[in-house]
Amino acid sequence: LGGHVEELVKDEGLVSQSDLPFKGDIDIDKLEACIEKEGADNVSFMRLEAGTNLIGGQPVSVQSFKDACAVARKHGILSVLDASLLQDNLYFIKIRDEERKDMSVRDITREIADQFDMIYFSARKFGFARGGAILVRDEELFHSMEDLVPMFEGFLTYGGMSVREIEAMTVGFDESMDMDIISHGPQFIKYCVDKLVD
């Protein structure tokens, strides 16, 4: 019943002294080779992080999301996005992706979300609130998860997150679409790095 994780980031993403703007991009050739080797029926899902924690929160380009999800769709594999660190990723897309510099953060978020079958996140990291959520596109998948909710969260009809927490999360999501707010973290880190270099 076991399984294993395959890390399929591009080799260039592991080079620390590099100007590559999206070091978190998935290597599509590695993804295809992995599916070929394991067999699509043996791949439960393809999971991407928006802001790749494994390599220091490096951002993923919208094109990489699109390409990876297209491969997953082609092979009938569920595509899953961990959007917990999406705010920083959105910031870097907005400033580094020429095609999306004039798009709103909200429109970029929609473009990313449209690619995936499932999105989950910790609201503490994305949304500035306690709690989290799992979003699914397929109603059958949604219903298949209902039996698991009482074991981890609360009953479907009550319990779980309070209205206050849901309200705080809603405000946090709205703030996460504001470039001034999502730029704080990356700009603070850049400031600290620049001071250390000086």
Q: Residue spans of the language-model regions?
A:
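Conserved PLP-enzyme active-site core in the AAT-like
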Residues: 1-198
